[in-house]
Amino acid sequence: MLNILMTHLINPLAYIVPVLLAVAFLTLIERKVLGYMQLRKGPNVVGPYGLLQPIADGVKLFIKEPVRPSTSSPFLFLAAPVLALTLAMTLWAPMPMPHPVTDLNLGILFILALSSLAVYSILGSGWALNSKYALIGALRAVAQTISYEVSLGLILLSVIIFSGGYTLQTFNITQESIWLLIPAWPLAAMWYISTLAETNRAPFDLTEGESELVSGFNVEYAGGPFALFFLAEYANILLMNTLSAVLFLGASHIPSVPELTTINLMTKAALLSIMFLWVRASYPRFRYDQLMHLVWKNFLPLTLAFVLWHTALPIALAGLPPQL
């Protein structure tokens, strides 16, 4: 009985609660970073140095009355944000930090499949609101997400050929001699840009173009449901950066100090997340056709070429992983 309780309740909770806390403070870091980049302080009133701001934001959002447009679809209106957050939390299950909640043989495929399902929550919310702005925003988001998933999938395939397995733990073993960032740096660059687009972040945040779309597919959401979307979006950002750290920034343990494994991975993921914020502060939004041109005309041919190249390399080098 205790075993079942541990596996099905305590373990998932011990995973979900820290992720949600990290998401809350990622919003604070974002506001602080953007503030300092614009030569201002950012949140500094609630608590010391504004540290309690995320808690105040969360309380404020969840005690607001959830207003629902009278013409919207009641079930879909609530189901979409719940689905978004559920998927965002489930995606963390196979992440090796250093031990995953569910040790899957095909962890990478699981992440790829579930991140594709997130499209349905966006589409559902855009359609349920019965508003033309929300629908256009949702269609943009869906087109963008599924386009960039093509390049993400091909990049993953190339990297999997290097590591020789679909489990995320094998990447730690592969990269004990050298980070995959070094032999596969063009893939790492394309992967990072694709994760920016996949998570709808600036400069790819076309779904939230205030000037033309009044904030996109979550335009009519307020209070609790909006907070769920918000949490899901930032959880996905953290997940993508943790995944980037596992895939390209290698073995999360230093052989001499194995105790630092988790801190090591967290530091890499946090630095990558701060780069997300840096990009947001630096670049203006793309035009929609440029966004699509980038993935279909630039990334797709390049990633296909790299898949061929990475297939040829292990055959030529007797299946050895990259080494110094």
Swiss-Prot record:
Reactions this protein catalyses: a ubiquinone + NADH + 5 H(+)(in) = a ubiquinol + NAD(+) + 4 H(+)(out)
Cellular compartment(s): Mitochondrion inner membrane
Any one GO molecular-function label of the UniProt entry: NADH dehydrogenase (ubiquinone) activity
InterPro entries named in the record: NADH_UbQ_OxRdtase_su1/FPO, NADH_UbQ_OxRdtase_su1_CS
Keyword Repeat: no
Chain segments annotated as transmembrane: 9-29, 75-95, 106-126, 146-166, 177-197, 228-248, 259-279, 299-319
Keyword list, A-Z: Electron transport, Membrane, Mitochondrion, Mitochondrion inner membrane, NAD, Respiratory chain, Translocase, Transmembrane, Transmembrane helix, Transport, Ubiquinone
HAMAP family to which the protein is assigned, alphabetical: NDH1_NuoH (MF_01350)
Descriptive protein name: NADH-ubiquinone oxidoreductase chain 1
Organism encoding this protein: Cyprinus carpio (Common carp)
Gene: MT-ND1
